[in-house]
Amino acid sequence: CPFDAMGSTMATYGGQNVGAGKLDRLGKGLKSCVLLGVGYSVIAFLIAVFFGGPLAQLFVDGGEAEIIANVCAFLLWNTAFYIPLALVNIVRFLIQGMGFPKFAILAGVFEMIARSLAGFGLVPIIGFTGVCLGSPIAWIMADAFLIPAYFHVSKVLQKRMVPQTDVPQAV
């Protein structure tokens, strides 16, 4: 998946730039990768809109109208939220590469909570649409944690890079 590749790229990019002390490059790389993710997301959504049915029929007999309709609905709901998915992968792995792996793990916990809430809360009320919304809700919940976390770890790293001038020197 392109989002996995973007995430792996950002982990390496984050680690290299933090190691080199070039924190100013992190935001530029993040912006560039997010733009790539948005571009891919739009293309994937358009493919799902215009070719979801034929794609489903590659795997399901054309006579299975209800299954094909469910596949199309699932594709549309998920691809409509690929931008938040792109952000999850890009920001999570960037933070991990910057040296803060616990934040990446916590984002996964938020995703798990969101999927559980969708499964137990939405599916009984709205049925299959609740299933379709499980992952998008998880991605949004992870982003709600990861985006502020990125700014937090950036500030932490900025403070680490600033030389301590108010510390008395030993003579």
Residues of each region from the PLM?
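Small-residue-rich hydrophobic transmembrane alpha-helices
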Residues: 1-52, 85-99, 103-107
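Hydrophobic alpha-helical interface/terminus motif in multipass membrane transporters
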Residues: 14, 55-56, 95, 122, ...
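Residue-level recognition of transmembrane alpha-helices
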Residues: 37, 75-78, 82, 108, ...
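Interfacial segments at transmembrane-helix termini and the short loops linking adjacent helices
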Residues: 51-78
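Membrane-interface helix-loop junctions in multi-pass transport and translocation proteins
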Residues: 53-54, 112-144, 148
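Membrane-interfacial segments
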Residues: 54-63, 126, 130, 153-162
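Hydrophobic alpha-helical segments of multi-pass membrane transport proteins
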Residues: 77-91, 141-153
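C-terminal transmembrane helix end/exit motif
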Residues: 136-171
